[in-house]
Amino acid sequence: MAKVQPKNKAELLGIIEIAINSYSSNCDLNFIDTSLVTDMSDLFCGLDFNGDISCWDVSNVKDMSSMFMNSKFNGDISCWDVSNVQTMEGMFCGSKFNGNISSWDVSNVITMNSMFFGAKFNGDVSRWDVSNVKFMRHMFCDSVFNGDISRWNISNVKSMIGIFCDSPLMNKKPEWYSDDESDLLELLMKR
């Protein structure tokens, strides 16, 4: 199939809809050159899609909020260059995704609110550079995530209300965690 290059999210959504309707929800979408797209928010939100998007060029994307929210997607996106993404809010919220994203460069992300809220994700994110993240509210709330994030640098986080509520991490919180956000300010001032 010939490469197709959408200029924006609206064009990309149209191409995805046609491909899924023509082939199946498990189709290969790597024929789409996504290098011009900067907004992928809500792209697969609520869809049954579980096809191949492993070769997508997402290097210019800034917004991935709710991209896979409540979706069945569980494909390989381990090689994605997410280094320019600024918001991943709700990206995998309520999704089935449990793939390898351990090597993602999230150093420019500012918002991770509800990123894995209610999600099946339990992968390794221990080496993520979250030093620029400011918002982690409900990030792992009601999820199965039980990984090691003890080395995360949360020095710029302004709010992490409910980050671990109803999750396995409630019982093994990292040393940097505080139940009270007013304590968080004190914790950060000691650093």
Positions of the model-derived regions?
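Negatively charged
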Residues: 1-191
